[in-house]
Amino acid sequence: MTSANFMNVVRFKLKPDCIEKYFEVINKTDFEGMIQRYIAKTGNYDYCFVGIWESAEAIAVQRSKMITHLDEVRGFMEELSPELGVTDPVSGNIVA
């Protein structure tokens, strides 16, 4: 197994009546190159997704599949702001 050196983090807020639907979809979703994933509940309907990847290249290869997945769950999410839309994503190399 390749040592993980890249991660992505996505903050989002679910609509109260869509929480179960979201987790049904996310639990069926798999991205090649993603070694592990975590979802933290950070508020009543607020969540933070963390994906651990083999490399920056691995996430780049999966980008179109990730956008398709977001399109599938977008309706389950509340807008965070007009500037951000429904997600607040960041990614980068794991340094510690």
Language model feature labels by segment:
Residues 1-68, 75-96:
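Short S/T/G/P-rich N-terminal loop/turn motif that feeds into the first structured element of a domain
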